[in-house]
């Protein structure tokens, strides 16, 4: 009897696998959201979506039906969400904005079926597109919206039904003809009900982007290679800058070109010549009260496709490659990149960028080589070599920094355990010791319980000129020196929560979220212990109330000047703690907000802070955001200061192609008031015109500089 039962279970799984098929049908459709072509009636229907949020129990009340096929040129998808109302709600008509605040349909594709990286395609209920790349980062996955490709979509409101029709060119996807199985996930966001529903069942302790939980679809008759080989994007930009204090100005005219060549359907070559990044959105400013640098994300498109190959070579706080270092002090002359799969289980990444010589900066050549190999279902290894070399014309100067390393990733069959081991070594002129980096991390993830532990050691000479290792650089505010010092860090954390499926009020309660970090100096003496304790109550509408307690024990070795005055904090032992209380409102309303207050000690003094974030939507024409943070620090005889950080973002959507965004940022810590206003017109798919105005003032609202930039590009696909 047991044998019969086992055979039956295997048969059921076999039948399900056979049903998950993307059929090949040699026909085209008109993407209009109407589904009136006969081919749609011939295709199997994929439905039975599960709840994901605010509950992950059972099948969804409002179901979704998905059909899909390909014709060796396009992957066609139709989706119908059976809503309970004719109303719809979207927060934006701007491309590449999170769909978390809109009614939308999402498809995720893992074309290599390696659970490492994938594609993200989303359409909101008014037809606005969002695309991006999903990449694995340690124990989870993140989403980068800066990657773009040309694809077609149409959304249609048909009574209570929300209909989505999509056509994705296969030429835009990395795939291997010998790998006929794609990992595919669908999910639907209904902002009106504040719900998420998903095709392949995923519990909420895992991200809905998690590529380990995709449905495996068999792809019939994949094409041998991409039909299109080239994408060329020439552009022209002009930039006027006026320095008010010194009464100088400068006008630049910059032609540039980007191209992409599909070596194979899974391996791509990218090149950029004389790139201009004047259209890139400004960074969101922060108040930094720590002793170390802050990480900001990469936004430049050239560095983004297959970016997980290059940017995921280390761990948080120790990353040997941080692409934002490239071009930060001098302009990029050219860059080339070869990235993708050379076999179904082998990925490579080769990157080379040359910067120009400036008045105070020498020209540099940056190179990165990465090899990623899937050893088994559970293990993946990565080896890398990074090089920065000073150049003089076509010659190399003996001034370099090189970093080599190897990483080993592990994931268990039940997806509850993830492990990571890292080793790196830095090579520099006349530096031969204390130049290593080690790390060992493990994560455990269960629905009610999550935990992690890690230990890493960083030598003071683990120099990564194009990396991000802020903690080895210690600024001595008394002697105005930067001292390199290695360290060892041990970390652990645990989070326990309980879900209340039958409650009319509570969604879940995070009873305990505790993290501990201990830092040892090169002599194995403890110089910093940090404790983080948090609990939160989440209600059915996803609003939340929470508290956070931070407690730090610091053995300060060098002078620290957070007030930016003439009286830095002197070296010594300090214990300080803060308590923060906060409330986040439901985010599916036209008006939403977050508020918090914090009070406690700070080194030898006191700290009081508060913050507020307000968002108001004028659907679907505008989105207004306002945030304000204040930090009052009193260090007794050393002085006191108050830091203000205010941000306003106003977005106006004229239609799906034309929008106007304005940022106002006031940061007293940086003595800056900044205005950045950008008009963006997508006059042809992924061909843009930008008009950007920037204006900078000091704390006293005295103008320091201003500028205006115009950029026009055009995309050719051959």
Locate each region found by the language model:
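Exposed, low-structure sequence patches enriched in small/polar residues
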Residues: 331-333, 339, 400-401, 414-718
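One face of beta-strands
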Residues: 64-66, 103-105, 119, 149-153, ...
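Bacterial Sec-dependent N-terminal signal peptides
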Residues: 1-21
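A short, polar/proline- and glycine-enriched secondary-structure boundary/capping micro-motif
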Residues: 86-93, 130-133, 175-177, 280-283, ...
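A generic beta-sheet turn/junction motif
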Residues: 70-72, 100, 159, 375-377, ...
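Catalytic-domain carbohydrate-binding cleft regions of carbohydrate-active enzymes
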Residues: 166, 248, 258, 268, ...
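Outer-membrane beta-barrel transmembrane domain signature of Gram-negative proteins
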Residues: 203-227, 356-414, 544-595, 609, ...
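Structural preference for beta-rich elements and adjacent junctions enriched in aromatics
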Residues: 17-372, 381-383
């Amino acid at each position: 009897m047991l044998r019969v039962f086992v055979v039956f279970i295997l048969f059921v799984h076999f039948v399900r696998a056979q049903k998950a098929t993307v059929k090949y049908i040699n026909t085209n459709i008109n993407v209009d959201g109407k589904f009136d072509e006969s081919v749609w009636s011939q295709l199997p229907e994929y439905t039975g979506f599960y709840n994901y949020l605010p509950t992950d129990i059972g099948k969804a009340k409002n179901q979704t039906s998905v059909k899909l096929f390909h014709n060796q040129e396009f992957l066609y998808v139709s989706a119908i969400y059976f809503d309970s109302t004719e109303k719809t709600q979207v927060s934006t008509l701007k491309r590449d904005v999170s769909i978390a605040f809109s009614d939308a349909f999402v498809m995720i594709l893992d074309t290599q079926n390696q659970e490492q990286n994938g594609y993200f395609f989303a359409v909101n209920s008014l037809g606005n597109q969002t695309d991006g790349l999903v990449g694995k980062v340690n124990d989870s996955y993140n989403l980068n919206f800066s990657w773009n490709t040309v694809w077609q979509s149409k959304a249609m409101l048909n009574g209570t039904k929300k209909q989505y029709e999509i056509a994705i060119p296969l030429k835009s996807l990395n795939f291997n003809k010998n790998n006929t199985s794609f990992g595919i996930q669908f999910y639907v966001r209904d902002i009106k009900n504040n719900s998420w529903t998903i095709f392949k069942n995923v519990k909420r302790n895992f991200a809905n982007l998690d590529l380990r939980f995709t449905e495996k679809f068999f792809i019939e008759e994949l094409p041998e290679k991409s039909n299109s080989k080239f994408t060329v994007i020439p552009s022209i930009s002009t930039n006027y800058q006026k320095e008010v204090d010194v009464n100088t100005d400068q006008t630049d005219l910059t032609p540039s070109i980007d191209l992409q060549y599909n070596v194979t359907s899974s391996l791509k070559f990218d090149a950029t010549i004389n790139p201009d990044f004047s259209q890139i959105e400004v960074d969101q400013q922060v108040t930094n009260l720590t002793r170390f640098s802050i990480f900001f994300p990469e936004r430049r498109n050239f560095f983004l496709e297959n970016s997980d190959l290059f940017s995921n070579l280390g761990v948080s706080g120790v990353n040997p490659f941080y692409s934002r270092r490239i071009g930060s002090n001098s302009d990029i002359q050219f860059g080339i990149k070869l990235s993708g799969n050379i076999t179904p289980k082998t990925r490579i990444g080769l990157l080379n960028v040359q910067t120009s010589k400036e008045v105070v900066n020498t020209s540099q050549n940056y190179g990165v080589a990465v090899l990623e190999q899937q050893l088994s279902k559970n293990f993946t290894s990565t080896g890398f070599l990074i090089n920065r070399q000073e150049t003089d014309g076509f010659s190399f100067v003996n001034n370099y920094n090189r970093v080599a390393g190897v990483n080993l990733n592990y994931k268990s069959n039940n997806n509850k355990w993830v492990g990571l081991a890292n080793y790196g070594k830095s090579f520099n002129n006349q530096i031969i010791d204390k130049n290593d980096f080690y790390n060992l991390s493990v994560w455990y993830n269960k629905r009610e319980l999550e935990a992690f532990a890690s230990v890493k050691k960083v030598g003071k000479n683990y120099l990564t000129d194009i990396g991000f290792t802020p903690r080895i650089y210690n600024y001595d505010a008394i002697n105005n020196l930067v001292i390199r010092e290695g360290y060892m860090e041990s970390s652990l954390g645990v989070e326990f929560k309980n879900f209340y499926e039958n409650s009319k009020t509570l969604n879940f309660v995070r009873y305990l979220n505790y993290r501990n970090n201990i830092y040892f100096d090169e002599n194995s003496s403890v110089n910093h212990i940090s404790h983080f304790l948090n609990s939160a109550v989440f209600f059915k509408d996803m609003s939340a109330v929470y508290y956070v307690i931070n407690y730090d024990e610091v053995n300060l070795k060098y002078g620290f000047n957070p007030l930016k005055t003439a009286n830095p904090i002197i070296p010594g032992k300090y214990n300080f703690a803060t308590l923060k209380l906060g409330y986040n409102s439901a985010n599916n309303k036209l008006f939403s907000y977050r508020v918090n207050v914090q009070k406690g000690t700070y080194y030898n003094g006191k700290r009081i802070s508060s913050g507020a974030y307000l968002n108001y939507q004028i659907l679907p024409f505008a989105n207004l955001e306002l945030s304000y943070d204040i930090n009052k620090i009193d260090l007794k005889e050393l002085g006191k200061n108050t830091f203000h950080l205010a941000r306003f973002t106003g977005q106006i959507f004229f239609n799906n192609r034309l929008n106007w965004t304005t940022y106002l940022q006031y940061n007293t810590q940086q003595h800056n008031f900044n205005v950045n206003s950008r008009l963006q017109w997508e006059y042809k798919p992924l061909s843009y015109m930008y008009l950007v105005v920037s204006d900078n003032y000091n704390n006293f609202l005295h103008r320091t500089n201003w500028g205006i930039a115009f950029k026009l590009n055009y995309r050719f696909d051959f």
